[in-house]
Amino acid sequence: MQNIPPQVQAMLGQLEGYQQQLQLVIQQKQKVQLELTEAKKALEEIEKVEEGTVIYKTVGTLIVKTDKAKALEELKEKVETLEVRLNALERQEKKLNEKLKELTQKIQTALRPTAG
């Protein structure tokens, strides 16, 4: 590490920061994907239910009664929100991957002359 120029050390620090950000984005993306899958399954099931069937939903630690129309509306809204969030996370992941690739190339280029 002592033979590495300060500017390369700074780039390595930046690279590590990008890697940590990417890890967080990937974790968030997985969580949103899971929530989206669950919401879509719930929506599918509620659409099969006849009108007038009693439906319950969880609100925090409570379970409350609701009707089909309201449950459908809320789930469709949730699916839409999660899809928007997922798209944003995918864009963020793509940008971070591009930054990582670019920075890795810069580091390799900077270290190449001293490697001989």
UniProtKB/Swiss-Prot annotation:
This is Prefoldin subunit beta. It is found in: Cytoplasm. Keywords: Chaperone, Cytoplasm. Its main location: cytoplasm. GO terms for molecular function: protein folding chaperone; unfolded protein binding. Molecular chaperone capable of stabilizing a range of proteins. Seems to fulfill an ATP-independent, HSP70-like function in archaeal de novo protein folding. HAMAP family: PfdB. Heterohexamer of two alpha and four beta subunits. NCBIfam families: gimC_beta. Belongs to the prefoldin subunit beta family. CDD domains: Prefoldin_beta_GimC. InterPro entries: PFD_beta-like, PfdB, Prefoldin. Pfam families: Prefoldin_2. It comes from Thermococcus onnurineus (strain NA1). GO terms for cellular component: cytoplasm; prefoldin complex. The keyword ATP-binding does not apply.
